[in-house]
Amino acid sequence: MAGNPDVVTVLLGGDVMLGRGVDQILPHPGKPQLRERYMRDATGYVRLAERVNGRIPLPVDWRWPWGEALAVLENTATDVCLINLETTITADGEFADRKPVCYRMHPDNVPALTALRPHVCALANNHILDFGYQGLTDTVAALAGAGIQSVGAGADLLAARRSALVTVGHERRVIVGSVAAESSGVPESWAARRDRPGVWLIRDPAQRDVADDVAAQVLADKRPGDIAIVSMHWGSNWGYATAPGDVAFAHRLIDAGIDMVHGHSSHHPRPIEIYRGKPILYGCGDVVDDYEGIGGHESFRSELRLLYLTVTDPASGNLISLQMLPLRVSRMRLQRASQTDTEWLRNTIERISRRFGIRVVTRPDNLLEVVPAANLTSKE
């Protein structure tokens, strides 16, 4: 749904993991065999989810994983949708060597992804080579066949570093580059080279020249009125802390001209910062996965999810508004979060982002809105 021509609206989601257990509930499940220590069959994750929240009506339709989120998004004026696709799309390939947890979705289940209508999928992450170069090749081809641009991984380093360009209206574009850091669990052997497929991998974000290189690559084709985004897979699965080197890296990207940093890797949301008028999402958390019923880390409430909606002034690249849609997963399906869960998310995001001067308020429509504390004070 096209938005206001005077602004650029981007929908951002974190990790979308449509493989493994989620793939098994879709109309065309792939091979369920796994090589995990505690689970040898992907249908086991379906049983875990059902044990917690009730029976899943197999097979589900394509819209099922997105659930109630779609009704909200279909009434939202969005120009571009960007997610981190953390699964391969393949029925082929070999399990990655010495990697116990591997994700794949059958190519015939791609309509479950296109139900969200993403424009760009970031692929620089620690699962895109779960089924080797063949799995990566199949994923890129499946996305292209569905009309979705992919960034951050490809046939060689040149392809992995190539940005996606999405035209907004007649003149403006959103430019997206996708990068992974070793801190997210991407092995050095997955790094793309001039003569080898792989991901755009950076070793140490704290090095100033690394941020300069990423920014220069993404900004190479930027014109006045364009919005430039770096989608960054970094950090551990759990925890709210932001590494000083990651903060410095994000700041340097924005100092160089990047308009938005889209962070992901953690299974729950991490802090938000508005730096020089530009948003930094240090971790968007999971959107779709098969983790229901898996114990541990309960204090992070990973069953609660957020989708992020940014509105940007293309003339300056500055953020106009940042809203979040609170969701809860049940039976591998997203539903609107309750008022209690929404308040928990509001309080948590505000608390962990306090060092960056962020306040979070609940809107009358039960969306959350990020407000820099200085702006909030000036209105009171």
From Swiss-Prot:
Disruption phenotype: Disruption mutant shows reduced PLG content in the cell wall, increased sensitivity to chemical and mechanical agents, reduction of biofilm formation and attenuated virulence. Pfam families: PGA_cap (PF09587). The keyword Transmembrane does not apply. Gene3D superfamilies: 3.60.21.10. Keywords: Stress response. Induction: A member of the dormancy regulon. Induced in response to reduced oxygen tension (hypoxia), low levels of nitric oxide (NO), carbon monoxide (CO) and carbon dioxide (CO(2)). Expression peaks in the late log phase of growth. Coiled coil: none annotated. The keyword Cell membrane does not apply. SMART domains: PGA_cap. CDD domains: MPP_CapA. It comes from the Bacteria. Could be involved in the biosynthesis, transport or localization of poly-alpha-L-glutamine (PLG), a cell wall component. Contributes to stress tolerance and virulence. Belongs to the CapA family. This is Probable polyglutamine synthesis accessory protein Rv0574c.
